[in-house]
Amino acid sequence: MRTDEGFVRAWTMAAEIAPERWRAMHADMILVLRAASWELERGRSDDTLAVLRGPEGLGQVRIQPEVIAFNGNAFLGEAGDPFSIERVAERGIIARRSRDGSRRVVRRCDTRGQPYDLAVCAVLLTLLHHLGD
């Protein structure tokens, strides 16, 4: 399989996540990112660049109280679309409301099959666990 054909991950979720629910999910996403990073870095020498980087493919993974965002390493040619989850979405909100009346947000991330796809999939499974469908 060619890695340039795209690995597009797309999902919808609530446009706003309740603070208590976000705190639990945020903590689990950090644990999952640490585990994914450990797996991605296993067997690599200490002088190589980290696989997971900030949303632009540079710097540190962005872990803030209301946002988690990351990408692959741009220096290694392993960056694709940034992956970002926010407690309160500011973009991508669709007008149609879900059954419970809340607004939804549409998200996508094309990792192009780069190594950080592992972290993207792991975080998406964490979202599914906490938020359901």
Residue ranges of each PLM-predicted region?
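Acidic (Asp/Glu-rich) sequence patches and key acidic residues
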Residues: 1-133
